[in-house]
Structure formats: structure tokens, C-alpha cells
Amino acid sequence: MSLLGDPLQALPPSAAPTGPLLAPPAGATLNRLREPLLRRLSELLDQAPEGRGWRRLAELAGSRGRLRLSCLDLEQCSLKVLEPEGSPSLCLLKLMGEKGCTVTELSDFLQAMEHTEVLQLLSPPGIKITVNPESKAVLAGQFVKLCCRATGHPFVQYQWFKMNKEIPNGNTSELIFNAVHVKDAGFYVCRVNNNFTFEFSQWSQLDVCDIPESFQRSVDGVSESKLQICVEPTSQKLMPGSTLVLQCVAVGSPIPHYQWFKNELPLTHETKKLYMVPYVDLEHQGTYWCHVYNDRDSQDSKKVEIIIGRTDEAVECTEDELNNLGHPDNKEQTTDQPLAKDKVALLIGNMNYREHPKLKAPLVDVYELTNLLRQLDFKVVSLLDLTEYEMRNAVDEFLLLLDKGVYGLLYYAGHGYENFGNSFMVPVDAPNPYRSENCLCVQNILKLMQEKETGLNVFLLDMCRKRNDYDDTIPILDALKVTANIVFGYATCQGAEAFEIQHSGLANGIFMKFLKDRLLEDKKITVLLDEVAEDMGKCHLTKGKQALEIRSSLSEKRALTDPIQGTEYSAESLVRNLQWAKAHELPESMCLKFDCGVQIQLGFAAEFSNVMIIYTSIVYKPPEIIMCDAYVTDFPLDLDIDPKDANKGTPEETGSYLVSKDLPKHCLYTRLSSLQKLKEHLVFTVCLSYQYSGLEDTVEDKQEVNVGKPLIAKLDMHRGLGRKTCFQTCLMSNGPYQSSAATSGGAGHYHSLQDPFHGVYHSHPGNPSNVTPADSCHCSRTPDAFISSFAHHASCHFSRSNVPVETTDEIPFSFSDRLRISEK
């Protein structure tokens, strides 16, 4: 079954394996047969006993006048035995082909000779699949077996596929999972082939249910095939406006189907494990249950009562507290101006996805936001292209910088989605399709920030919020604390996608385009975001496409411009400063002197916390040397640097468009990205090639340079802090700041804008470390394109392929005279 419940039909792949010999068309003449087939036919005829060999074939062919061979022809065939690789039968078949003998006629002759072995080469037997694999729903950890059986001659071979990927060692009739895992869920098909042809089995869907531990006892000894409900819905008492989520999970073979009922009536289109109402009202009160069935059996879940109304909770307080309710103690209002103990920001931009559409806007957005936040005295860590493991470790490092009263800001630009009010950030190594276990849950990070007793928690999420249909897990997160200091700024509203502006090669996301114009304003953060939302609403490019959504529990007038308390020399502050400075320390500029007298200057600049640029220049050349070139090479394998992308004449050629105006001219530039992957010191080689006057030969010299661990590499993020489990998604969030509507399935972003950018950090002592914001990009500067991009799910398209594959084809439609919107 497909995800929509339709039967899946397996079609042969475009490059399906075939046997070494292909059966020829019946009406083709023998001279149209392929050489390998002719030689195989000839070998069998040459080796055949008397009465079934080539002479008997010539005799039968002679019975048809036009195919009769002369004595000279037969003698010519006989003499072929005297040649080293001669074959009388091959000679005969070619002569018959010249006379117009068809495959059908040859088959008739072989039938008369009862030469079945040769006959099978011309009419190979087919393959018949007798047992197809069944779709089934199972529990994680169960023993599972998918079975396919077929008959054919001489024998058949099996190969299993999951979607479009061949399964290693899956070459038997049974595909066995000793302890099935959630990642094993998906669609499977078996290809059966022999030397002549191949067939595909029916599709089999394997649904693996990972149920909470609280249900484990009730499902011990569950059968792989018997229909059984493992997770029952539960009765609930909800306030109007809350989210209702009912879950029923069943296992069995064939795969179970679901139908939800309310008050004895079936609910239209509610045929999944989950039944959800984003905002309940009195009309949703009633009795609910789920009918589960397959072709062999059916069961009903237990009936549950959903009550909508006020809860009867009592809150204890003293008489003084009751009298002061609504009149805050003036002693607590120590100042009219909120102060931050410190300000820390983590900025992550994911662009170069391995199995999903690549993005461009995060490069510009993270760079510009870094410059702006540093002007507001934020300690900023900016990182590009992180894997899941690296994202988790980056968050760990971010949390180390937080403390009581510290302002924490997390910005993310990249693919994302939102399910059941929980936002998920997608790492660059996420599989296709991805699920919650492959991503980072923002609400989990918020909980960890709350544990630090931060003064302000700001989340700016520049990603899509569409629902991920491949992820049906309901996260159960620990309850968030009720703190009046949380602000969420979503680039788009629930269930919608985010867009980017293209302009001359570089890109801004729509959100950042408007945010950067107001970020430095001294206003309460929620007021600032409200004005950004108003600006976006006035732009004709975004109307009906993207709208900023703000969620906040902020009760004080806190702003990103709030000053930092005068506690510069407290122990906590010193630790934070040291930790942050450690992640932003560049190697010192150096001058290399070679024996020939040539001097080469090495400089270093930071584009992001994990991206560094090395620039080299020849500062002195003795007069007797008429030519010399210098370049850097032999970088650690951890950084995966392509030599073709190193030692370029301009920063732009290396992919560094943002800092070119701040780098010295007339150098060779090499861009090192993903410094977080560096496990040892950064050691590389500086090579010098030079030529003396009057000599034709070129002389080579080299020096090895060790610059230690630059920037973020010093934190050894590849080792981690052993806290990965802190971010693992559990099952249903009841936090007060979570969306109640179901939304996005892999989401995404972006593409480009050619403006001057400033703010590169150099290792030269004389260079300033402050930065200036990029020029604003106003709507009056009409961009080249306005593009929506979101992560695509592997869709069930089966034309010309044996499995559904992801497509990135664009379907453009008119948007304005100079703009185009592409929906991927």
C-alpha cells in the first residue's frame, strides 16, 4: 500500500539487470541475432550427438526450398573444424541467415530435432512469482521476515530493495530482521531474475511502531501476523482552544487500517493512527474510539471520553499574596531598564544538504545577523553546514555559555518542519525521508535553556513549518517551566513555507531581509518583531505567501539592545569570555623565509566560526630570481578540501563572497570550511616554485606549517559532551509555547544577492575586530527571482522505475512581470 492507501505497483527499473543472453524477436532473421547468442547456439549444435547436430539442421532446412544449401556450402561448413576457433554450426547459421531464415523457422527445426536445450535459448522460460511479500505493521525489536518465492528455469536469484536502494546481502528469498528498528520502516520490493529475464514482486510496506515503555508490558509476545492493538486512546479533559490528540497503534499482517469514530459515527477522512484537533471547542466533546481492521481481522479500541471545559485546579497562596495580587512588590522593581548579565547567540545555517535540495540564503543571513548582533554586544557563534552530531554538540557548547540572567538567542536557517507544535531543525546529513530522530527539536533546546535560568530566550527560526508526513511520532517532552521570558519569531506561519530573494548571485531569506533593517532598534523584542511583520505585510512579494508569526510569554520590556551588567570580572563572566574567545582565536599572521631568500606572508581571516580563509603573498623576491609562485597544499583529510578550489586569485573563486572587500589584494586565497571536523592540529604545506635568471630549470621548495586548532576547532566538537540523549525526541508536548496545529514535512529555503559585505576578522593585530552591517536590501530593488523552496519527500512515482524516487523538477508559474515563483 502507498502512504495514501493505494496499492503500489512495481515496475522494472530503467536499468534493470538482464541475463547475458536476450531472447530474440520471433520474426527476426538469424543474421540479426547477437553474436554471443549465435556462438552459444553453435557450441551446443557442435557438441550435439549424431542426428541432433548441424548436419541434421542443414538437412531439415533444405526441406524448405529457399533455405537449401549447396554441396559447396556444406563443405565450407565442414572445413571450419580445421580452423583454431572454427565452428561448422556457426558457419551454417550465418549461411541460413543470409538466405532469410527466421528465428521462428529455426525454432521449428530444433523442435523437430527435439533439441530442447538449444530451443530454450531462443524461447527462454519465464519466471513466476508464487509468494509475494506481505505488508505488515510490527513493533520495534520484533523478529520480522519478508518472504518472496518464485519458480523458473534453470534457477532463479533474488535481490531485495528498500525504495530505490539495493539491500546488502539481501539475495535470498527471505529478508530477515532479527530485531527490527524504526529506521527499517519503508517500502520493500524483491527482484527475481535468471539468465534470461526478471520479474518484480508486489510492494511490501513495513511499518515499525516504536511505542513508549509504559505500553511494553501489555504487548509482550505480540505475534508478527495477528492483528492486535498495542496503544489505546486515552480519555482527556481539555480547555477550549487546546489541542486534542488521540492515538491508536496496531500491529499485524496485512498492515492494519484505521477508522476513527465519534458518538457512533465515523469521522470523515480520519483514517490514520493519529486523530488530532488543533483547537478544540465544546462541539468536540464526546465519546471516541478507533476501528482497526485488515483483510483477515478487525478490532475496536476502547472508548474514551473527551470533556471540554474549565479545570478545577486550586492554587495555594497566603493572605498577603492574595492581597498583593496584581500589585507587584515595588522592591522587585529595582530598575526601569532591564539589564542582561551577558548576551550569547548561536547561529546555524545549513545549506549543502547531502540528500535534499541545497540552499543559498543561510550563508548571507547568518553572516549579516552575526555582524548586527556583535554590534549589540552579543557573543556570537556562527556555524555553517552541521551534521546532526555536530548540531547537538554546538548546542551543548552554546548552553555552556548560558547562565542565570544571560540573554540567549538561537537563530536557525535551513530545512525544517513542524509536527504537533514542535519545531525540528534538519541537519545536512539527514536521510531522505527524515524523521524526528534525525533532527533537533527546538522545544527540547528551550527546556535546557530554561534550566540555566536565562534572562531572555529568543528563537528566530528561518525555516519552513510544513508537516512531515513521514514522521508520525508524537513527541512527549517534559513540561516546560512557566517563565515569562520566551520569544519565538517564526519566518512563516504554521503549515507554510519560507522564501528567499535572489539578486545577482547571493541570497537573503525574506525574514532576514526585513529583520536586518530593524534589529538594531532600541525596542522591546516583541515590538520589534511586530514591526518586522508589518514590513513584510506591506511588501507585495510576500502577500499571501509568507507571514511572520510571533509567540511570546515576555512580561518585561526586554530588548536585544539592553546593556550588560557591570560584572565583567565575575567568575562566571570570565569563564564565558574565555570559552567564547577560545572558539574565535585565529592563528597569528606569519612570514616564512626560504633558503633562496624568498619571503612569503601567510594571513588568516574568519568568515564564520567554522570557516577560515588563508591568504598568501610573496613579500620579497631576490633580484636573481626571475619567477616564483607560492601555494598551500596537503591539508588534513578531515577538512575534505578539493585542491582545485584552493589557491584562487580572488576570494569569490573560493566561494567566499562576503569578505572579499576586507581582504588584502594580490594574494592567493584558500577557504577552509567545516573546521569543527578537525581532529588534530591544522598542518599544511607551503610550496614554493622559483627559477633563477639564466637557468631553464624550475626549483621546488616547501615548508610545513602548524597553526594549531583555529576557531571552533579548539572546542573539539567532534568528541561531544556525552549529552546527545538530552535532545532525543520522546512522545506529546504540552508546553505553553507550542503550536497546536499540525504542519511541515521537510522544509527549506533559499538562493542569492550581490551587495558589498563587511566584517571579516583578521589575524593581523592592526585590523579592527568590529563589524558593520551590510547594506539594506529594499523592496524597490527588484530582485531577479522570488523562490519558494522546501524539502521534498520521496514521492510515490513509479514511471520508468521500480521504486518511487524524490524529484526536484520545478513547476514554474507566473507571479509578476519580473518575478517567478518556483514550487519544488
From Swiss-Prot:
Annotated InterPro entries: Caspase-like_dom_sf, Caspase-related_regulators, DEATH-like_dom_sf, Ig-like_dom, Ig-like_dom_sf, Ig-like_fold, Ig_sub, Ig_sub2
Main location: cytoplasm
Keyword Repeat: yes
Motif mapping: Nuclear export signal: 369-376
GO molecular function: cysteine-type endopeptidase activity; endopeptidase activator activity; endopeptidase activity; identical protein binding; peptidase activity; protease binding; small molecule binding; ubiquitin-protein transferase activity
Annotated tissue distribution: Highly expressed in peripheral blood mononuclear cells. Detected at lower levels in bone marrow, thymus and lymph node, and at very low levels in colon and lung.
Cysteine-cysteine disulfides: 147-190, 248-290
Catalytic site: 415, 464
SMART domains per record: IG, IGc2
Positions of the record's site feature: Breakpoint for translocation to form BIRC2-MALT1: 126-127, 216-217, 320-321, 323-324, 329-330
Caspase-like, as annotated region: 348-562
Function of the protein: Protease that enhances BCL10-induced activation: acts via formation of CBM complexes that channel adaptive and innate immune signaling downstream of CARD domain-containing proteins (CARD9, CARD11 and CARD14) to activate NF-kappa-B and MAP kinase p38 pathways which stimulate expression of genes encoding pro-inflammatory cytokines and chemokines. Mediates BCL10 cleavage: MALT1-dependent BCL10 cleavage plays an important role in T-cell antigen receptor-induced integrin adhesion. Involved in the induction of T helper 17 cells (Th17) differentiation.
Subunit structure: Homooligomer; forms oligomers which bind to TRAF6. Forms a complex with CARD14 and MALT1; resulting in the formation of a CBM (CARD14-BCL10-MALT1) complex. Forms a complex with CARD11 and MALT1; resulting in the formation of a CBM (CARD11-BCL10-MALT1) complex. Forms a complex with CARD9 and MALT1; resulting in the formation of a CBM (CARD9-BCL10-MALT1) complex.
Family recorded in the similarity comment: Belongs to the peptidase C14B family.
Name the UniProt record assigns to this protein: Mucosa-associated lymphoid tissue lymphoma translocation protein 1
Species the sequence originates in: Homo sapiens
